[in-house]
């Protein structure tokens, strides 16, 4: 989360994820899309050579239906120029291998300044900002970066069982291969339905900031290099805050945590589960100031992690000091009190950072819808 003065920049772009997309039945008889170099109908791909290689960031692609009525397939790919000469991406298409690699869905992503960054790579060598200055279609030799996708469909049933990328690249300095068009082997789209949860708090006035999927904001932007891999550890995370009828998040100037409307709110279990991780004694941060000297373990601040079963973990971050009421090993029911909302850890303003993860971590994980 940014400072109080920047808080409402992200509200309009936040997307509530309301309905699960369950492709399990529809895709149960789909071909094995992980078979190398074959299309959905079993034909071999033509062998093509190009300078770029890419792979999925995270453990999978998880479709979900949003409050806009569209089904969203949000994911990220790491691109690397494996050759020594610069290469320029001319176009990137998401295609359906089961339909002879026809384009599928509508892909569009924007920066926090509403700049179109579709088909551009957030380069590792550029400053880490969330505006278009971090992105480019040109990748130097040996350089890498991340490309973000939000592929939307009118209906959940329109989401394919697998996708590939068709990438058209030019490399004028390469006299032997100045141009290439490569279609990657297919990647399965998860058939796992999004989990349906109870709210993590009571009352009115709550809004979801920094939500998925169109805007590459503070959560979707994050791809952490942890334990040798890049993880989209916050791609579906939400910063929950509370505002009044005037759209203000605090009573006066927001300079103290207690001045914020959401501070001290009771946080509730969203589903039955087991407490697997707790931190409770970190101090609150001063709103508007960037925290210093935090260890990696302290980034989520005081927090509770619930094992919901089925490889899903609910994480409540930035809780108030000394307010966590549960302990590791406790069993909780939906609606049970876990503690109070605060401003501890890597935060510049009180809010509840909430996410579902495939592992009990806010860093070494793929966030789930």
Which residue stretches match the model-derived regions?
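Short, solvent-exposed loop/turn segments enriched in Ser/Thr/Gly
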Residues: 57-59, 69-76
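Asparagine-centered strand-capping/turn motif at beta-strand->loop junctions
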Residues: 78-86, 96
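Short histidine-centered loop motifs in beta-beta connectors
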Residues: 268, 308, 312-335
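Acidic, glycine-rich catalytic/binding loops that coordinate metals and/or anionic ligands
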Residues: 191-209, 217-221, 251, 268, ...
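Zn2+-dependent peptidoglycan hydrolase active-site motif and core
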Residues: 261-262, 272-320
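Terminal connector regions
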Residues: 151-195
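A structural signal for short beta-strand/turn segments enriched in small hydrophobics and glycine
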Residues: 273-275, 329-341
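Intrinsically disordered, low-complexity Pro/Gly/Ser/Thr-rich segments with frequent PxxP/GP/PP motifs
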Residues: 107-157
